[in-house]
Amino acid sequence: MKKQLKRTKKHDKKDWKQSICAKCKGLCCKYITVDIEEPKDDEDLDNIRWYLIHDGISILVEDERWMVKVDARCKHLQADYQCAVYNRRPEACKQYDTENCDYRTVSENLPKAYREFEEYGRLRRYVKGRWAKAHRGRKKKR
């Protein structure tokens, strides 16, 4: 696992300028995600539909993890894409892993680690397919 670059007051700017973060335009600072439960039935799916009728909202699915993505730029992201409160940033920002960051995915042309759904119809088809696959799996075990 690669060592995550940590900037502090004693930070060497030369190292930071060579880091992946220095090449990025703050992609991870332009949205937040909130974990949600995977929908188990049509009522759950309709509740997720409510999220998707709002602008700037999408659903991310990464393996068994489900999240609501809210497009919302951090108020501390500066014009040069650096953090204005870097030394006092929240713990979530300190723990952010650059190994699977959005910039690396785009710059290295890697597949995303998650599926993103902005449109309910596409999400509904995906979920119904998962339910059908799970149902077939249960029938085979009998």
What do the PLM-derived regions correspond to, one by one?
Residues 1-142:
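Short loop/turn segments that flank or connect secondary-structure elements
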